[in-house]
Amino acid sequence: MSSLNIKQGSDAHFPDYPLASPSNNEIDLLNLISVLWRAKKTVMAVVFAFACAGLLISFILPQKWTSAAVVTPPEPVQWQELEKSFTKLRVLDLDIKIDRTEAFNLFIKKFQSVSLLEEYLRSSPYVMDQLKEAKIDELDLHRAIVALSEKMKAVDDNASKKKDEPSLYTSWTLSFTAPTSEEAQTVLSGYIDYISTLVVKESLENVRNKLEIKTQFEKEKLAQDRIKTKNQLDANIQRLNYSLDIANAAGIKKPVYSNGQAVKDDPDFSISLGADGIERKLEIEKAVTDVAELNGELRNRQYLVEQLTKAHVNDVNFTPFKYQLSPSLPVKKDGPGKAIIVILSALIGGMVACGGVLLRYAMASRKQDAMMADHLV
């Protein structure tokens, strides 16, 4: 009986406990979809507006077209005319050599020079005409040229390879980005030709300097050798004068070997020729006007100097690189296309429209719940 009383007593207190209220954290997806469907016209209008804005932006955005060229070191067949022009100079014992790899490296070095690029842009009629049409002052012109120079790039195609991975050949990609495809190709091609001309001019100038230095060296050395030979001739003449005096004093008129006499000759002042022979030899020595007449080596040196003086280096047109891809005419602009911009703009517009509709619905629902709560109170 006691247990029955306890159960009845406990059941009597159940109404004192409030019932659990339903959870408000659940999301009714069907209701949200219904809300969006009712506002479909608003959503579509916003999406259309964003798509139109994206299309307009795609036309307003600056166009970027990139022209590219791929170059490698020159091949021997390209330099045949240059090598032929150096044949006569090499015969004259002139060490002349233009290394193809060094010429290519010099081309890349000058291509990456910012000062040379600015110099080219300032001297290029095409670029200056484009900038002058904008009617800008000197400071703005300098800024525009600096901005253009940043769009000229040279990339080593082997730089991305691993160190232990061998490369078959050296290759560089040269590129320039401009507002139009024609401008990109024209500027890149013109700059490559400009740098190539500088490399050719500098290489030939180095050869001319070597020729000038060699010629000057041989001239000065020949002059010194002539002085040495002249001094030796003067010493011989003076020695013959002393020998003549000694021969006259000794009474030796004829060569001693013609008389069958045995005379021990003086190594310093020879009298074996006799006074007559010494006198005749002295006349011959004094009659020499050009010391090179009796010196074959000196005459050969003089001939070399004459040939070096006549030699000259002709202007030979050669290319310090070989095109694997000539400056291309871009057919596709850089960056996203108009279709992608419009699609992304439409997606952003859809998200903004849906978010706005749902936010407005949430605020209206909260306001309605607050009014109902006030009404019940």
Curated annotation (Swiss-Prot):
InterPro entries: Bact_polysacc_biosynth/exp (IPR050445), LPS_length_determ_N_term (IPR003856). GO terms for biological process: ferric-enterobactin import into cell. Residues 63-338 are periplasmic. Pfam families: Wzz. It is found in: Cell inner membrane. The chain crosses the membrane at residues 42-62, 339-359. GO terms for molecular function: ferric-enterobactin transmembrane transporter activity; protein tyrosine kinase activity. Residues 1-41, 360-377 are cytoplasmic. Induction: Repressed by H-NS, induced by LeuO. A monocistronic operon. GO terms for cellular component: plasma membrane. Signal peptide: none annotated. It is a multi-pass membrane protein. SUPFAM superfamilies: Bacterial polysaccharide co-polymerase-like. Keywords: Cell inner membrane, Cell membrane, Ion transport, Iron, Iron transport, Membrane, Transmembrane, Transmembrane helix, Transport. Its main location: membrane. The keyword Signal does not apply. Part of the ferric enterobactin transport system. NCBIfam families: PRK10381.1. Belongs to the WzzB/Cld/Rol family. This is Ferric enterobactin transport protein FepE. It comes from Escherichia coli (strain K12). The gene is fepE.
